[in-house]
Amino acid sequence: APEIWFLGQVGAVILLFNSGLESDLKLFLKYSKQATIVAIGGMALPFILGLAVMVSFGYSDNFTDTQAIFMGTVLTATSIGITVRVLNELKKLGSPDGITVLGAAVLDDVLGILLLTIVVGMTASTENLTLIDISIIIVKTLGFWLGLTIIGRLLSGHISKLFVKFHSNGSLLVLSLSLAFISSGVAEFFGLAMIIGAFSIGIALSGSELAKKIEKPMHGISAIFVPIFFVTTGMLVDLTTIASYWEFGAILTIAGIIGKVFGSGVAGLLAGFKPKDSLKIGVGMLPRGEVALIMAAIGIASGALTQNLYGAVIMMTFITTLLAPIILAYLYKTDK
């Protein structure tokens, strides 16, 4: 039903706005060098493997095909929320490898959402895109994200002071969510993925007094709308297609695991971490969670993903999200 789909989209905006709010930019800047190396490694290998799987299974003719690029983009996703919860429960959020994973996950999401927005722009075009067209989409996407983040960051103190005058946390939440929805609407107006607006304004407001004030009510509203988003993504899955295309789903899942664990893990070694800590970093970057689901939902809505490819993405997301906390807990428990 259109109403449920609309509520699901509201849930997606709230989810990404919250992810942005929870992104600690100061922490990221402290370990920015290591986090950047890990994020690049954790994006490059999954992206290449995503392209390779699509071409080898015959879903795409070449590596420049939009569907192949979209699948590669989905494989780059890392869930900040799941990674934070796991490291928090293990009391390892403040450790060097924990902070690096968190910083890399933030950068991973920023780059992944930028990449997604570029691919959506490519999909929206009915004509064959030239290099100039693609360059325009990239410049537009980067310009929008940087512009919104910088303006938001510069104004976050003023916005926070203005909003905090409303003593009711409920009023603060309504005003903050209004900003998220307006930013999403502006992104859509420019032909970009709406989630880039919500995520960017969330990052801009992260660490502010306002972010602290709306933390509790944000969890309350998330508990209402976010499950609706997960229900709508589940409703789009045709279980018969998963059963029919399980081989592709299995290979995509293996590519997703190898891409993150090896890509981020080897990058961790290059960043100066010990082998076991590098493995923890690789596994910490593994869960795809809500980020991949949002990307997949946008993919099916924009026509970049077919039903059977969507089912394979859901399978890969579910398995990687399930495996990561178990393996990470085991790796930390076996520390001397």
Predicted regions and their residues:
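Transmembrane helical cores of multi-pass secondary ion antiporters/exchangers
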Residues: A1-K336
